[in-house]
């Protein structure tokens, strides 16, 4: 039984939540998000909170209710506060710059990499070695950050590569003679 599903999601001021059959829409100051709710979960909106209850007899209903609660909570936080993910470029000559809605990356390859940002994600480069991604959809921000990191993941010997701001790269010792 999921304990996550038992905690209701509170709706902050300025956020509007509507439920149309199995489609939940959350609108706020930063934007709006829509999600289709699993059939094994009943959603109840009352008194400024959203409650998640499993459907009787459905297999894995408590697990689905907990997952749905976590996803809806991320939607509410996203439209009210937004999410951001920071990336650092570590290495000689590694640079990033913003060109329109694209990020131009120089990561030690023979050619520059151009990463197109999807709709709903904005980027900022406070310095040549820092990238800040912002948006309302937590999953989309994480996906874009993982794609950019995937071009040159941090390697364990010198630590060069693209890493998350809070990432600790496990270093290895060089081979002994």
Curated annotation (Swiss-Prot):
This protein binds to the 23S rRNA, and is important in its secondary structure. It is located near the subunit interface in the base of the L7/L12 stalk, and near the tRNA binding site of the peptidyltransferase center. The keyword rRNA-binding applies. This is Large ribosomal subunit protein uL6. Residues 152-171 have a biased composition (Basic and acidic residues). The lineage of its organism: Bacteria, Pseudomonadati, Pseudomonadota, Gammaproteobacteria, Alteromonadales. Part of the 50S ribosomal subunit. Residues 152-177 are annotated as: Disordered. Belongs to the universal ribosomal protein uL6 family. One of its GO terms (cellular component) is cytosolic large ribosomal subunit. Keywords: Ribonucleoprotein, Ribosomal protein, RNA-binding, rRNA-binding. The keyword Glycosyltransferase does not apply. GO terms for biological process: cytoplasmic translation. One of its GO terms (molecular function) is structural constituent of ribosome. InterPro entries: Ribosomal_uL6-like, Ribosomal_uL6-like_a/b-dom_sf, Ribosomal_uL6_a/b-dom, Ribosomal_uL6_bac-type, Ribosomal_uL6_CS.
């Amino acid at each position: 039984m999921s304990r996550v599903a038992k905690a209701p999601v509170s709706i902050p001021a300025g956020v509007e939540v509507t439920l149309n059959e199995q489609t939940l829409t959350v609108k706020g100051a930063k934007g709006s998000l829509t999600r289709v709710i699993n059939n094994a979960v009943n959603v109840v909106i009352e008194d400024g909170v959203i409650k998640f209850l499993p459907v009787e007899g459905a297999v894995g209903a408590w697990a689905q209710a907990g997952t749905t609660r976590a996803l809806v909570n991320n939607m509410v936080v996203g439209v009210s506060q937004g999410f951001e993910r920071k990336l650092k470029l570590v290495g000689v000559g590694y640079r990033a710059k913003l060109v329109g809605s694209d990020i131009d990356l120089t990561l030690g390859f023979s050619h520059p990499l151009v990463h197109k940002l999807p709709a709903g994600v904005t980027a900022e480069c406070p310095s040549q070695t820092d990238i800040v991604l912002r948006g309302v959809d937590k999953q989309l921000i994480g996906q874009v950050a993982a794609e950019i990191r995937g071009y040159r993941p941090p390697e364990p010997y010198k630590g060069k590569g693209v890493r998350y701001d809070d990432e600790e790269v496990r270093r290895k010792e060089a081979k002994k003679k």
